[in-house]
Amino acid sequence: THSHSDHIGGVECLALMNRYVGIKFLDKPKLTMLINEPYEKVLWEMSLRGGMEWNEVNGEGKRLGFSDFFDVVRPTLKTSVPREIWEVNYGDIHIELFLTNHIPEQAPSSEEAFITYGLFVDNRIFISGDTKFDRELIDMYASRSEWMFHDSQINPNPVHACLPELKTLPKEITEKMFLMHYPDNAQANAIDEFAGWAQQGMRYIFD
């Protein structure tokens, strides 16, 4: 969804291990990456390139690039209004990727923020990704969502939604909203109006 290390910190290691162990010795394919062209450039140039480009030259005698590690699946631009939304079908899964307003603190809207995305899966499940409290975004997807997973800090935060802000939402939204990306001590707080805290390591299956 975006380039902070708590979201991409393992990508370099995963890609290198796959190239030099998985592909070389275990007959594994390249990793599949669902990513649009604007974010691929950001991810490679600003985060991954320094640790991945110089490990060898490829079959064409060039230093390694993004496509040497990943089979890329491109979303298509669905709309730019009221915010940028991309979509892609991967197997039986349909995914929308929508811009969020996460960073910098001073960005007044998703259009003026650095590239960060949230997900809407199979026209059913909303995953906010990292975002400030953005009522416009929530209202765009709330009526279409069976369940919602939303970024939540406990105290006011300049780049994340916080619990007091999310508690201003109507019951028909909060009762289907799980809170995620919360600090370790968050569960000491009462959230009876919400669906619950999203649990680390838990697989959620929606029939």
Regions found by a protein language model. Name each.
Residues 1-126, 185-207:
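Binuclear metal-dependent hydrolase catalytic cores
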Residues 114, 131-207:
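Cap/insert and terminal regions of metallo-dependent hydrolase folds
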